[in-house]
Amino acid sequence: MIKKVKASLSEKIIFIFLITLGIFSLTSFLILKNKCLFVKNYDPKKIKFDNPENIAVLNVSCGNVIIELYPKVSPKSVERFKTLLRSNAYDDSAFHRVIEKKLVQAGDLEFGKKNNLDYGKIGTGKSGLGTINSELGGDFKYTRGSVGLARSFKNNTEDSQFFIILKDEPLFEGEYTPVGKVIYGLEVLEKIKYLRNTEYILRPD
């Protein structure tokens, strides 16, 4: 006669632990495999904007990033940004600089295109339109989501490259030309550093 063996308390605890560990491991794997899993993708066609002419949409792997531009703050810089957007110049432009939890930068139209990357020069390219003068924004506050034009170490060297900050940066105020602020989809940018697709992470800091 076969006797039914009862599991001891310690065996039950081990069994429950292994099951829990398995579920946790599977969940972690699925999340790591798809970093966009919990990121909301905003459809600009379903959002009513007060001034649609001052709205820019960036298409990133995890979804759309919607930016409100501020022509009253930096008129010439915003016009340059709009000109490049209208001509689709930013299409296939890689995020070549990513500082985790601080900022992402893109817009190198000469060396930073995904289909024509130059790893030795990326970040130094131009648009072909020439540089423009800095517009340092007066009382503009560089709070989380603000968008500014990148430049060299000197003022009046802004061109096509832009950055978006992921945290408040008061030290940027009066130093970099602001062009707008992300109003939807900032969480999309926070996922860039973790994507395995290297077209988005070329020289992470």
Give a label for each model feature.
Residues 1-205:
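Cyclophilin-like peptidyl-prolyl cis-trans isomerases
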